């Protein structure tokens, strides 16, 4: 491993657990500021963060035991200046359990400290704070506090889930302090063990020998992706029942679909590969005059990619990377309607239109990445829009006219979403357009005309009225209060991988049902206000996303600012392309009862 890089699998490993037996705080190693250029801000763990955490708990740590085999991770002076005694107790790890001598030294050290200062915590860390750390804490609980080894292992697992996850460590603990036959099976490896973009060519503590640690069976040299998460019971399109849709949960089919979508999108990481827009602010709005853009309305829909891979092989992929099989949805080949499309990947959103008071689900296609194996995502956006209309929508319409597609059997309708030149934004916001759309419109999307880019895309801008700006948080309801104060129930709001709350909100009786759920909140009168639960998401917004939204709240791009800026852009564009200045956005197509819907 590079001497300047973070340890393997460290980045998304939880920073710390909860106190064990009121005495020990297990944690991973901290990394000093010298690693900041290697570690994203939301993943950092400086010594100062430990100090702030202890202050928030109103507890004091008097001793920190460092079990790693290196001194490069942080400066011990940053610990000692907080009045915490630092002790280095090197412990190999990597397939070697702590020796009897090391265990005895740890126990004597902690026993001596606790006798002198029984009210102060002892911090313990190895590289990740699970196996070596858990082993020695459990040994102390058994030898000095008369715990059974079963109770000690269970208590550590509860305080630092999933606990000790190396089977040989568990067996050695039970061999020393119980019956090795009673040793529990090692728990499944935690998700962070499968982190992508981690170096694997050296020991976690920075020495040069080859790694002997997990996860060898799942983390091959060919792929450094995280293990894909499986969300059982995923909901397809909240609020309406859609026939013929079922979640794909069996392997290898699930993995094959996920990998195909990632490969088609040229996404070399795990998770959902779709392009993600960023919030418009007063800085990035200038990209609209520097680059070519198209605009469309922002529907309050649910994001899905669609993989078309043959007859009865149509799949939808949501932002949690959950996969749904869609029955009775046909996509014929334009040049021969008897042939079904395959190797085709679309991007779009499911919306719920209101037609005669009844909910009607529709899929709006707004981009295409692959068509019959061809990388159309590399083409400019105008050509991709043409491809959607000509190769996806029109062949379906032709086959409907021939009576060869039974619309009544399809689970939902499929349409292409139109995009316009940016000067049409005023019509989209102020004209009769919104009244002619049968679903909720909550802003605008500005799409660059360049090639498709997977993941977060700083070029795709979403604009919402300042009153609609929102953040998706993970809500954790807890009681807070110091000595002599009445405990109060508050909602702590978390983003990204941070284990410190980003903000907090007042908790009502109705909000208690959303504990540990993802909720969308807006900022009103200097407080975060609940909008809705996001059942389509399992993770909160990233820290950078939340900060961008906060910036847009503090320095909003109002409708007036936006339209005035676009007016100037349109004048520049019309001088370059006079013929385009006459284009106006048509209203969404209104179809008669006798016409065939797309």
UniProtKB/Swiss-Prot annotation:
Keywords on record: GTP-binding, Hydrolase, mRNA capping, mRNA processing, Multifunctional enzyme, Nucleotide-binding, Nucleotidyltransferase, Nucleus, Protein phosphatase, Transferase
Compartments in which it is found: Nucleus
EC nos: 3.6.1.74, 2.7.7.50
Chief localisation class: nucleus
Species lineage: Eukaryota, Metazoa, Chordata, Craniata, Vertebrata
Protein name: mRNA-capping enzyme
Region (TPase): 1-215
Family: In the N-terminal section; belongs to the non-receptor class of the protein-tyrosine phosphatase family.
Family matches, as InterPro entries: Dual-sp_phosphatase_cat-dom, mRNA_cap_enz_bifunc, mRNA_cap_enzyme_adenylation, mRNA_cap_enzyme_C, mRNA_Capping_Enz/RNA_Phosphat, NA-bd_OB-fold, Prot-tyrosine_phosphatase-like, Tyr_Pase_AS
Biased composition annotated in UniProt, kind: Acidic residues: 193-206
A GO-annotated cellular component: nucleus
Sequence segments annotated as region (GTase): 233-598
Disulfide bridges in this chain: none
GO molecular function: ATP binding; GTP binding; inorganic triphosphate phosphatase activity; mRNA 5'-triphosphate monophosphatase activity; mRNA guanylyltransferase activity; phosphoprotein phosphatase activity; polynucleotide 5'-phosphatase activity
CDD domains (alphabetical): Adenylation_mRNA_capping, Mce1_N
GO biological process: 7-methylguanosine mRNA capping
Claim: Nucleus is one of the keywords in the record: yes
Active site: 126, 298
Pfam families for the chain: DSPc (PF00782), mRNA_cap_C (PF03919), mRNA_cap_enzyme (PF01331)
Domain spans labelled Tyrosine-protein phosphatase: 25-183
């Amino acid at each position: 491993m590079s001497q300047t890089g973070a340890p393997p699998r460290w980045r998304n490993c939880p920073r710390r657990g909860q106190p064990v037996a009121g005495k020990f705080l297990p944690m991973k190693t901290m990394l000093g500021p010298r690693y900041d250029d290697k570690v994203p801000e939301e993943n950092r763990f400086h010594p100062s963060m430990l100090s702030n955490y202890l202050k928030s708990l109103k507890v004091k740590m008097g001793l920190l035991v460092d079990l790693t085999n290196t001194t490069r991770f942080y400066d011990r002076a940053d610990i000692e200046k907080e009045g915490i005694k630092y002790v280095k107790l090197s412990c190999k790890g990597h397939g070697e359990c702590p020796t009897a001598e090391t265990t005895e030294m740890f126990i004597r050290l902690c026993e001596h400290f606790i006798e002198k200062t029984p009210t102060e915590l002892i911090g313990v860390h190895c590289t990740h704070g699970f196996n070596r750390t858990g082993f020695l804490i459990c040994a102390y609980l058994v030898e000095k506090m008369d715990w059974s080894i079963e109770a000690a292992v269970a208590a550590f697992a509860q305080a630092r889930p999933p606990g000790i996850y190396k089977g040989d460590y568990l067996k050695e603990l039970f061999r020393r302090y119980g019956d090795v036959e009673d040793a529990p099976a090692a728990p499944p490896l935690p998700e962070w063990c499968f982190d992508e973009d981690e170096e694997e060519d050296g020991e976690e503590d920075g020495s040069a020998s080859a790694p002997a640690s997990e996860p060898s069976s799942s983390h091959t040299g060919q792929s450094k992706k995280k293990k894909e998460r499986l969300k059982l019971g995923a909901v397809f399109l909240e609020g309406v029942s859609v026939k013929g849709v079922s979640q794909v949960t069996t392997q290898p089919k699930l993995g094959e679909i996920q990998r195909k979508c990632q490969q088609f999108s040229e996404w070399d990481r795990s998770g959902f590969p779709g392009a993600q827009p960023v919030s418009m602010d007063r800085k990035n709005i200038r990209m609209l005059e520097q680059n070519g853009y198209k605009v469309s309305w922002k529907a309050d829909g649910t994001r899905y990619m669609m993989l078309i891979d043959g007859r009865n092989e149509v799949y939808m992929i949501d932002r949690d990377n959950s996969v749904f099989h869609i029955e009775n949805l046909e996509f014929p080949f334009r040049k021969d309607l008897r042939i079904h499309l395959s190797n085709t990947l679309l991007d779009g959103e499911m919306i719920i239109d209101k037609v005669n008071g009844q909910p009607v689900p529709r899929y709006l296609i707004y981009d295409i990445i692959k068509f019959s194996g061809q990388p159309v995502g590399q083409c400019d956006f105008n050509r991709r829009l043409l491809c959607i209309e000509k190769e996806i929508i029109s062949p379906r319409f032709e086959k409907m006219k021939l009576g060869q597609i039974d619309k009544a059997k399809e689970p939902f309708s499929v349409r292409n979403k139109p995009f316009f030149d940016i000067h049409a934004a005023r019509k989209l916001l102020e004209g009769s357009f919104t009244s002619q759309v049968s679903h909720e419109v909550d802003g605008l999307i500005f799409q660059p005309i360049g090639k498709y880019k997977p993941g977060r895309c700083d070029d795709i801008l979403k604009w919402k009225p300042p009153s609609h700006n929102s953040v998706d948080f993970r809500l954790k309801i807890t009681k807070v209060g110091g000595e002599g104060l009445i405990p109060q129930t508050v909602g702590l709001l978390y983003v990204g991988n941070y284990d410190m709350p980003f903000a907090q909100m007042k908790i009502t009786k109705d909000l208690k049902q959303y504990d540990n759920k993802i909720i969308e909140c807006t900022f009103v009168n200097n407080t975060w206000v609940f909008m809705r639960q996001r059942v389509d998401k399992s993770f909160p917004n990233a820290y950078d996303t939340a900060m961008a939204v906060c910036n847009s709240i503090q320095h909003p791009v109002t409708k007036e600012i936006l339209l005035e800026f676009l007016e100037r852009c349109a004048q520049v564009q019309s001088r370059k392309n006079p013929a385009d200045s006459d284009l106006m956005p048509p209203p969404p197509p209104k179809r008669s009862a006798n016409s065939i819907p797309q």
